[in-house]
Design a protein with these regions (language model features):
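Short coil-to-beta-strand
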Residues: 12-22
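Short beta-strand segments at enzyme active-site cores
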Residues: 16, 61-65, 111-112
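Conserved nucleotide-binding/hydrolysis micro-motifs of P-loop NTPases
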Residues: 19-21, 66-71, 117-120
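Conserved small/polar residues in nucleotide/adenosyl-binding loops
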Residues: 1-5
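Active-site loop/lid in soluble adenylation, ligation, and acyl-transfer enzymes
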Residues: 6-8, 26
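A glycine- and Lys/Arg-enriched "phosphate-lid" helix/loop adjacent to the NTP-binding pocket
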Residues: 24-97
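NTP-dependent small-molecule kinase module
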Residues: 72-138
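Loop/turn-to-beta-strand initiation segments
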Residues: 9-13, 59-60
Length: 138
């Protein structure tokens, strides 16, 4: 289902990532690292502004907050080849941008869950805990 179609359904739609993250975290990070030229970055932000008028914000944004050591541990456990070269510096920059963005998020309801002591992939009890937190917010 595409983002546009999610506005017309009565069912809950779960997305792994929002358009906000691209505009407020990944694009500025690439620009700051010199991997996205300023002109492209400005064009991207202009496109993002246009999209904001077309896409309804989520009814509930769930932010899974994590420390860098926990992120590194999860990445190693997953064992994905394309994630093996992610540097601590890159993760730290993204984490800082996520924290700044989420602190100022005002487009809808926000559920912030610190997952440093939760393993919802391997531990059913942790999974149920997170589900209950989400159900309370919906």
């Amino acid at each position: 289902m595409c983002i546009r179609d999610s506005d017309s359904t009565k069912e809950n739609v779960i997305q792994d990532r929002t358009i906000y993250e691209d505009a407020f975290i990944f694009a500025p990070n690439l620009n700051a690292m010199g991997l996205m030229p300023q002109r492209d970055y400005e064009n991207y932000l202009s496109l993002f502004d246009t999209m904001l008028n077309l896409v309804k914000p989520p009814d509930l944004l769930i932010y899974l907050q994590s420390s860098i050591p926990n992120l590194v541990n999860k990445i190693h456990k997953r064992g994905r080849d394309y994630e093996k070269t992610i540097s601590i510096e890159y993760l730290s920059r993204l984490n800082e941008r996520y924290e700044a963005w989420i602190t100022n998020y005002d487009s809808g309801k926000l559920l912030k869950i610190n997952v440093d002591d939760l393993d919802f992939v391997e531990n059913k009890s942790d999974y149920k805990t997170i589900l209950e937190l989400i159900k309370k917010e919906l």
